[in-house]
Amino acid sequence: MTAEGGVQYSKIAEIKGPLVIVDDVENAAFDELVEVETKDGERRLGKVLEVGNGKAIVQVFEGTTGLSIAATNAKFVGKVMEMPVSREVLGRVFDGLGRPKDGLPDPIADQFIDINGEPMNPEQREYPKDFIQTGVSVIDGMITLVRGQKLPIFSGSGMSHNLLAAQIARQASVIGTQDDFAVVFAAIGVQYSEAEYFRRSLEESGALKRSVLFLNTADDPAIERIITPRVALTVAEYLAFELGMHVLVILTDMTNYAEALREISAAREEVPGRKGYPGYLYTDLSTIYERAGKLNGKKGSVTQVPILSMPSDDITHPIPDLTGYITEGQIVLGRDLFRQGVYPPVNILMSLSRLMKDGIGEGSTRADHGEISNQVYDAYSRAQEVRALAGIVGKAGLTEIDLKYMDVGDVFENEFLSQATDENRTIEETLGILWKIVSKLPRNEITKIKDKYVDQYYKEE
């Protein structure tokens, strides 16, 4: 039966989990948008996951609760899901499917763009090399974020990743340029209180004016979580590559996204992979993470900070494990530091920004940045070794230089790593604290910094 704007079918073979299986379907296409109508006239959106042998498997975004085989119709609308985009999306709050959630009307659209995006031609990619200042010392100083990079945060259940995500969203900026900067924030499967915190945090700081907020809460259908990062990245790509803005995309929590993917896979009775996740989890995650970058001839950039909570703090779990293969480093939050009350509790010895070397130094941050960072990494690593030794032989068994390294570890955690959630430090302040840490050591222990920088910045205590 042909309906206005599409083809309508009423022969539903089966409803299983979030899926509706439609019989006797002709000419349906993969990813095609479907309107599923209930007996009460309620319309729910879905998309085609699989077509073959006259059947179509439809994934219903709002869930299948209340649907019956006898009284459900499915209209195949003949197009893929698209997100309306324009400059007017800035300052707006949307739900996980891209519908307004702030009580305001739909923004006037300049374009309608397929949420799956266009793959970036590797030949057209430009190497990321420009510094983004987050105002968080440990990131700016030791795990530097670069425009066009994808740098995930690996956290654990109950830790302070949401505070860190909101702080980065409020404070992030590009320095040394007049280019426009925007933040696209997508909350995926978060609690209502967390969603409200993100909204209030951006509103009260004034950062919402340059931001676009997508909120998918825990009581929304799990299947909606598959769509949320894609609509967010569609908006980010439009702002970056059509309007020439530098866009930071924060996605939290990607673990909830992967759980939704596992739910769909189980409903389709696919052969499970590691821990029940589908075998294509790596490929699916790459379709999200690889949408970060810069393009030759385009002024803007898309930078991603995906956040995921590691089940049981297990960094070898499939989600962080596969994420690490695709992205360019990781920021790992440590449970021990969190228990000590350190914020942000970043374990720098497990963290890395693979593109840091290209975004720092003279002309970007400061000429001594790379060397002072390496020296502090070395000193903090030595401090951890000394702490372990002190746990065995006691402080009385330590040498004078060992005690100095212990002091370095304490100053690093209490003055550099720790900062208030509303404290926005410049890169100059961050580097100043790093030199204060190094100055706790005798000059002959400083082996990774050129003498000219030591002469300029070192102040022995």
UniProtKB/Swiss-Prot annotation:
The keyword Nucleus does not apply. One of its GO terms (molecular function) is proton-transporting ATP synthase activity, rotational mechanism. Its main location: membrane. GO terms for cellular component: plasma membrane. GO terms for biological process: proton motive force-driven plasma membrane ATP synthesis. Keywords: ATP synthesis, Cell membrane, Hydrogen ion transport, Ion transport, Membrane, Transport. It comes from the Archaea. PROSITE patterns: ATPASE_ALPHA_BETA. CDD domains: ATP-synt_V_A-type_beta_C, ATP-synt_V_A-type_beta_N, V_A-ATPase_B. It is found in: Cell membrane. Component of the A-type ATP synthase that produces ATP from ADP in the presence of a proton gradient across the membrane. The B chain is a regulatory subunit. NCBIfam families: PRK04196.1. PANTHER family: V-TYPE PROTON ATPASE SUBUNIT B. Has multiple subunits with at least A(3), B(3), C, D, E, F, H, I and proteolipid K(x). This is A-type ATP synthase subunit B. The lineage of its organism: Archaea, Nitrososphaerota, Nitrososphaeria, Nitrosopumilales, Nitrosopumilaceae. The gene is atpB.
